[in-house]
A protein has these predicted regions:
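N-terminal amphipathic/basic-hydrophobic helices that include classical n-h-c signal peptides
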Residues: 1-30
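Bacterial N-terminal signal peptides that target proteins for export
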Residues: 30-38
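Cleavable N-terminal signal peptides
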Residues: 39-40, 50
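Periplasmic polypeptide-binding modules associated with outer-membrane biogenesis and secretion
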Residues: 52-64, 71-300, 309, 323-341, ...
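Gram-negative/organellar outer-membrane beta-barrel architecture
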Residues: 146, 244-433, 450, 460, ...
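Extracytoplasmic gating/loop element in the C-terminal half of outer-membrane beta-barrel translocons
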Residues: 278, 464-542, 548-550
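Short glycine-rich, acidic/polar surface loops and turns
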Residues: 525-528, 556-564
């Protein structure tokens, strides 16, 4: 027996030896036995932290076999890796079981004497066991269900090397599919994996008797403050339809998305199922009648901003809702109230009435706006949203040398789609938006105009550490009465979400007095690359460009670098940018909070 070699072990063994030397046996046979017993007991009582812990080195394996064996051996606790016979037997047993799991039933395993702190295990896996027969049979109504036969086609096939996990996976998938599709009485009449190692053959036998498929029964709403007929439009199934668990999940999500409920739970009531029909229980908890939110924000465009929101998620039993928001900063103050009226298809179609007030005092713009709009919205399964609107705008303004009071009625149409994957800091996403509005004295407007504005933005990633952003914004105001058009309909560029390196809405034509006048046209673009520094922190480098012009396009260029933090409330962006078009251009700092699309 080799003595332990660690410093702690040597100290303990030296204490034992000293004790024995101080108590000589004087030749007594009994005393010799006592000494040997003492040594053995002391070794057994040694704490685990002083015993040697051996590493295991595998030789002769590769691929899936090597990975599976390594996984088995990694489960052996360090205190058990003591080089004992029991440890070696455990290693051999685990290697054999791990190889059997991936189809090797006749391995040759050699455990070499430990070299230092390493036990070398040499393995010849031997010939693999291949699947000779796959006997998968479905009876009952599942026999005519293509989804079950698709599972069989994707499972183990004759000629493939046996893998126990493939067999278990197929068995589990059949059971899971049966539950998802309502074969609640289904069971295996045969479920065996037979292996003949000497012949290197395996036989898979799975016979599943599904019985009859269940149908949806009655829908029982509990705790709802909203009319049941409104909730019915949120589900894509009816009593009597074939049961499908995904229908319940989609219904649950649709209920949650309405904002009417603090919690929603849709589940099959199996205890009351009869005659192959399962009732559906919908348990709902109403959302609070009034919700208040306050917040403080900051951006370099408008400085500090105070926000207050008041929402009534459900105003009445028909599911109408009301929201009012107030935002106050030094250059801008806005008050907006929105009333939403869901239609028969409550999750996809609704009317919206909006009232708004806005006061602006920013550089060469002084404006007071009052707006009223009515809009009709459609949401499609493709992700696109469409709306038509009628908006009345009253604006008392001073823009450079232009001063006026204007009233315009703007019928319009908008199409938009936003797609994201990956939460608040998406690794993939895009946004497309296009808005067209028109005004004419024929429908009580002071001026005639056509206004078009659009955005296209894209986020794409290469693995987890590289991220790119491309964004293009454009607009046009077509009118022979441009100088009568209010500032809110003209175009400006520059700022945190436009051309960084330039001040907020400072890119614009100027009038004879040198003051900003706003533009007929606007086109800006951003190209940005981001690299993950670690965790939720990113480094960014970007180039921005564009212009807002009336007669002559003068492309503005800027570039810079910055830091991104994916915070719990959304991306926070800190950038330093520099313009390249004027001798007096300087570095500008931009700080923003919010989504990039």
């Amino acid at each position: 027996m080799a003595l332990a070699s660690s410093p702690a072990q040597r100290v303990i063994w030296q204490d034992i030896i000293n004790f024995v030397e101080r108590h000589p046996s004087n030749g007594s046979h009994c005393m010799k036995i006592r000494k040997l017993s003492l040594i053995a007991i002391a070794f057994l009582l040694l704490p685990s932290w002083v015993r040697a812990s051996l590493d295991v080195e595998l030789q002769g394996l590769e691929g899936e076999a090597q990975q599976n064996v390594a996984t088995y051996l990694a489960a052996i606790a360090p205190e058990e890796r003591d080089g004992s016979y029991r440890f070696k037997a455990r290693v051999e047993r685990d290697v054999r079981q791990a190889l059997q799991a991936v189809g090797y039933y006749q391995p040759k395993i050699t455990l070499n004497a430990p070299e230092g702190d390493t036990l070398v295990v040499s393995v010849n896996p031997g010939p693999p066991v291949n699947v000779a027969q796959v006997d998968v049979v479905f009876s009952g109504e599942a026999a005519m269900d293509d989804d079950f036969h698709s599972l069989k086609a994707k499972g183990p096939q004759p000629g493939h090397r046996l893998n126990h996990s493939d067999y278990e996976s197929l068995k589990s998938q059949i059971q899971s599919l049966a539950v998802k599709k309502g074969y609640f009485d289904g069971r295996f009449t045969q479920a065996r994996l037979e292996v003949a190692p000497d012949r290197q053959q395996a036989f898979i036998r799975l016979h599943f008797a599904s019985g009859k498929r269940y149908h949806f029964g009655a829908i029982d709403y509990q705790g709802s403050q909203i009319q049941h007929k409104r909730l019915d439009t949120l589900r894509d199934f009816s009593p009597g339809d074939l049961y499908q668990v995904t229908d319940l999940g989609e219904f649950n999500q649709a209920l949650a998305n309405t904002g009417w409920f603090a919690s929603a739970l849709v589940q099959a009531d199996m205890e009351d199922a009869e005659d192959n029909e399962v009732p559906i229980k919908v348990t709902l908890t109403p959302e609070a009648r009034n919700k208040f939110e306050t917040g403080v924000g900051y951006s370099t465009d408008i400085g500090p901003r105070l926000k207050l929101n008041w929402r009534k998620p459900w105003y009445n039993s028909r599911g109408h809702s009301l929201s009012t928001s107030l935002a106050v900063s030094q250059p801008e103050q806005t008050l907006t109230s929105t009333y939403k009226v869901p239609l028969d298809d409550v999750s996809r179609e609704y009317y919206q009435v909006q009232l708004g007030l806005k006061n602006t005092d920013q550089r060469d713009t002084t404006s007071f706006e009052a707006t009223t709009s009515v809009s009709r919205h459609w949401l499609y399964d493709t992700g696109w949203q469409r709306s038509v609107s009628l908006r009345w705008l009253y604006e008392n303004y001073s823009q450079g040398q232009d001063e006026d009071i204007v009233s315009v009625v703007l019928p319009g149409v908008n199409v938009t789609r936003t797609r994201v994957r990956g939460g608040l800091m998406p690794h993939w996403g895009d946004k497309q938006s296009l808005t067209l509005e028109a005004a004419d004295p024929a429908w009580l407007s002071d001026i005639s105009l056509l206004r078009l504005q659009g955005r296209s933005a894209w986020i794409r990633s290469l693995n987890k550490n590289h991220r790119g952003l491309l964004r293009v914004d454009g607009g046009a105001l077509i009118s022979e009465e441009f100088r009568e058009a209010p500032p809110s309909l003209r175009f400006f560029a520059g700022g945190d979400n436009s051309i960084r390196g330039y001040g907020y809405e400072t890119v614009s034509p100027v009038d004879d007095s040198g003051q900003l006048s706003g533009a007929r046209y606007m086109l800006t673009g951003t190209l940005e690359y981001q690299y993950r520094l670690g965790g939720n922190w990113w480094w960014a480098v970007f180039a921005d460009g564009g212009d807002a012009w009336t007669n002559h396009l003068s492309w503005k260029r800027a570039a810079g670098t910055g830091i991104r933090w994916s915070s719990p409330v959304g991306p926070i962006r800190l950038d330093v940018a520099h313009g390249f078009d004027n001798d007096d251009d300087d570095f500008r700092v931009h700080l923003t909070l919010g989504p990039e699309l």
